[in-house]
Amino acid sequence: MTGRIERGISAVAASPSVVSIGFFDGVHRGHQAIITQAVRRASHHQVRSVVVTFDRHPMEVVAPGSQPWLLQTLARRVQTLAEHVDLVVVLPFDDDLRHLTAEAFVEYVLLGPLQAEAVVVGRNFRFGHRASGDLDTLTDLGKAHGFVAEGVDLLADDDGSAISSTEIRAAIGAGDVARAAELLGRPHAVDGIVVRGDQRGHDLGFPTANLQIDPRVAVPAPGVYATVFHHPDGRALPAASSVGTNPTFGGQELRVEAFLLDVDEDLYGLEACLDFRARVRDEVRYESVDDLLVQMRDDVRIVRRLLEA
């Protein structure tokens, strides 16, 4: 399934719907449980399944500068959501939307062309100005306006803690990409454009694709990782990737660089996706280039073994 994507309520054709609402950063396993229940309800009622999401993190508007790192770009998040439902509606989270009361939000979002018959959200769902509305508010408004509100219990991990975007960001920030993948239900990935670097990797015999990443998106802690480079032509290419500043050469700028194990071709200008499968080691400053080369060859052997396992 690949659903339609519309920007703004006014672009949506009128039709009954079962709706789920949220920012859904990362579209992790907890989000997927909510959306799956919405799809199940929509199928039962023979209406379309809809996700309503927002073009930016609410904190970017409510308290600029305090917003967290994102787990996905908007384009990637919307694409992921569209794989699950019939329609994704992207609302601009601006001052007008921010100041809507809970009831005004319901009237604007749910009672127009979406014609909501049911609304499925997580039990911690908040909405309306200053997050004044909760699941009980939504339930009461549903009774008044003719839709059913359903709260889905937060999905818990094996240790009993609720799966959350916050926990996933913490895992990524610590370089624990395996843990992040468990919580997401897939590897953490970053999208970027391949740009020219300083050519040092090429000179050393390890040409790398330097990815220009959206600075708002979370990247793992500095280190070397086993990764898969998703070429826009559909190929999934094994890669040893580094996140860091190249301290051996006195670098300062954080970079994401991928050495493709079995491919050496011109990648400049391509839009690619890099997913992180396993952490290999920390970033280290080496005393000599020869020491670095020995380590890089070892890194490649380890990455190949990890990706073939």
Locations of regions flagged by a protein language model:
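General small-molecule cofactor/ligand-binding pocket signal
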Residues: 4-6, 88-91, 148-152
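N-terminal Rossmann-like or analogous alpha/beta NTP/dinucleotide-binding catalytic cores
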Residues: 60-145
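Residue-level signal for inorganic ion chemistry
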Residues: 28, 81, 119, 180, ...
